[in-house]
Design a protein with these regions (language model features):
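Structured beta-strand-rich core segments of catalytic domains in phosphoester-bond hydrolases
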Residues: 60-143
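N-terminal, active-site-proximal structural segment of metallo-dependent hydrolase catalytic domains
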Residues: 1-77, 82-95
């Protein structure tokens, strides 16, 4: 358990987190019920082992499913700032990132590219993130 005067953060790449019967990137990529349950159980065990306060997630195709799982694991606050792209009925081709917290997420918004930084790195104004980052303000009642 964390000390009362600290907050811990982690990141977690979920590797194609998509609830069946949907497919990721190709119509052949669909988890069976058993595979999905194993993935959910493995993620839950990993989250328990991390025992952190705030988690940033990558490769989310099923945000609602992840939000439910995180709530069950003691993270009642969850946010994404974008929607996964669905190519054709149930074929998902572009996941999103998200954040889960044990503490209230007061504000969440997409991170926008900064024009000065774009210029400094010789990037044009058409630059966009492959997956829109999340900027979140979290209330920490114990600090």
């Amino acid at each position: 358990m964390n000390k009362p005067n600290q907050v811990t953060f982690s990141t977690f790449n979920l590797l194609n987190y998509l609830e069946p019967p949907n497919a990721y990137y190709d119509f052949e990529n669909i988890y069976s019920f058993d595979e999905w349950q194993k993935k959910q159980n493995w993620i839950a065990e990993a989250i328990r082992s991390l025992d952190c306060d705030v988690i940033g997630f990558q490769e989310i195709f099923s945000p609602e499913s992840l939000q439910r799982l995180m709530k069950e694991l003691g993270y009642p606050y969850f946010a994404v700032v974008d929607n996964p792209h669905v190519e054709d009925d149930y074929l998902y081709t572009s996941p999103v990132v998200g954040i889960a917290s044990r503490y209230p997420i007061e504000n969440v918004q997409p991170v926008k590219p900064d024009s000065e930084l774009l210029s400094a790195f010789n990037l044009n104004d058409n630059f966009s993130f492959n997956r829109t980052p999340v900027h979140a303000t979290i209330t920490l009642p114990h600090l």
